[in-house]
Amino acid sequence: MKKFLFSLFLILFVQSSFGEILEVYTWKPFPGRSEQLLQTFQEAAAIHSKLGIGVTINALGVGTSQNMDYVLRYDDLESYGRLKDANFYDEEWNTFLAKARANPSGELVSSWSANNIDPLNMADDFTEEGQVIAFFRWQPAPGAVGLQTMIQGASESKPIHESLGARIETYQINSGENRGQVL
């Protein structure tokens, strides 16, 4: 039992410390302003990309009111800190942010962050133009055993989906809405 708990702790520590980091911001466009929100996202993405931050824009089509996700990706904790600082002090970003805040086209409805279970995955793996991305959130049973069982199940199903041509990544939400869920 001690070996199992130590292994579980080690797995959770490694994934939280070294894996790719996502920040997901879900926005709801104001009525009639979906196009403007998308244009705002594209302008923000151009600035973030210049700074070296991976960006994905997802229109949520099921169960939402035209909500959109703006996703920032970082390779690891070091690049997260370095790029967040660069973004904070970037003149182009701050000018853009002031303009977007003066005439918003939507409202932020949620935000959260997650770590990739695979510490070797890099943020730029998701920056290919035209990629189709889908997220599925799973709530593990309470406790460390529930989380480990969920991660094991995701790992076991991965080869099945990949044999059908899909690319599968598993993340654990570590802050914000639905903390502890697995993607």
Q: PLM ranges: what are they?
A:
Residues 2-3, 101:
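Basic side chains
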Residues 18-183:
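Short S/T/G/P-rich N-terminal loop/turn motif that feeds into the first structured element of a domain
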Residues 3-16:
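Sec-dependent N-terminal signal peptides
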